């Protein structure tokens, strides 16, 4: 049993088939199939049921997948510890960033990190908090930005804590106000976030607490697109203040939102509790402490 065989097997499951696994691993489909077959032979049991182009884990495969992910994670951590001996002259940062504010908050930090550590390769994944958390637990990511977690499986470092603003069409009856209460938007169609965004849950909880269910008309993880829909008169979107400030455009007004205290965008950078953090990840966290988010004057 070899690590390359374990990695091929894990990627077949994660990517949904041999062809996609081969693309991820930069080897041919036949090479992936051969490595999985060799793994099954060495273990003496089938790990996959092959149904046409589909694959499904056998009972043994489920056990092996769990152990293989743990072994690959330990292998990666071993390599990371060895990389530390080279003082970041090489290495890899597997980083997750929130979709909503990638350009607003992280483009400059990303560039500064690359300037300081040009030989560190960055593997970047953007997504909602659920996607980031799952990727960290599986070992796909080492550290990532997420709404502050309550799950003890994660350790975290606070990054920012932003209120939400409301972006409204300029012809909305409340558009001339300086602020708006969440319950005043009960009859306005809502543009929501992707389902992987935990912020959706907080918004729904806040609305239900105030006695209404928001009228959802669409979802997106792209703040620019959501603002464009507002400008087209499609509804209201609630966005972190630091993001909303940069999205005001013709046809859109920004109002301060009055809502329950828990409806905030409190981003932390999280990692698996007890996991070894590579020097590359430690350097990223140190950079975040060096350049904290500053609240602008409203």
Name what the model sees in each region.
Residues 10-28:
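Short helix-boundary/capping micro-motifs
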Residues 14, 40-62:
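A short LG(V/I)-centered, amphipathic sequence patch enriched
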Residues 88-152, 213, 219-220:
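Central regulatory/effector-binding core of bacterial HTH transcription factors
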Residues 105, 253-296:
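A late-sequence structural motif
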Residues 128-133, 137-141, 147, 196-255:
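Hydrophobic hinge/microswitch elements
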Residues 153-158, 162-163, 177, 224-273:
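Beta-alpha-beta core module
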Residues 154-190:
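Flexible hinge/capping segments at coil-to-helix
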Residues 189-210, 277-287, 294-298:
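Secondary-structure junction motif
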């Amino acid at each position: 049993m070899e690590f390359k065989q374990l990695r091929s097997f894990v990627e077949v499951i994660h990517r949904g088939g041999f062809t996609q696994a081969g693309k991820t691993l930069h080897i041919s489909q036949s090479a992936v199939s051969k490595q999985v077959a060799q793994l099954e032979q060495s273990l003496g049991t089938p790990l996959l049921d092959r149904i046409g182009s589909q694959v499904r884990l056998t009972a043994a495969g489920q056990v092996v997948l769990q152990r293989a992910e743990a072994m690959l994670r330990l292998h990666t951590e071993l390599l990371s510890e060895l990389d530390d001996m080279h003082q970041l002259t090489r290495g890899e940062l597997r980083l997750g960033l929130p979709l909503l504010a990638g350009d607003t908050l992280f483009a400059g930090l990303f560039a500064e990190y690359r300037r300081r550590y040009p030989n560190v390769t960055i593997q970047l994944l953007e997504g909602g908090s659920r996607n980031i958390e799952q990727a960290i637990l599986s070992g796909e990511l080492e550290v990532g930005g997420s709404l502050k977690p309550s799950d003890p499986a994660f350790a975290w470092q606070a990054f920012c804590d932003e209120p939400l603003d409301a972006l409204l069409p300029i012809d909305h009856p409340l558009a001339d106000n300086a602020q708006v209460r969440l319950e005043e938007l009960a009859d306005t169609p809502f543009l929501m976030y992707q389902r992987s965004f935990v912020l959706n849950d907080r918004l729904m909880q806040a609305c239900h607490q105030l006695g209404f269910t928001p009228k959802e008309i669409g979802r997106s993880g792209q703040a620019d697109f959501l603002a464009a829909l507002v400008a087209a008169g499609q509804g209201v979107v609630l966005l972190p203040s630091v993001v909303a400030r940069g999205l005001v455009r013709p046809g859109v007004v920004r109002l301060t939102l009055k809502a329950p205290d828990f409806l905030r965008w409190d981003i932390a950078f999280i990692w698996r509790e007890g996991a070894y953090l590579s020097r590359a990840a430690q350097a990223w966290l140190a950079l975040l402490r060096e350049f904290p988010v500053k609240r602008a004057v409203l």
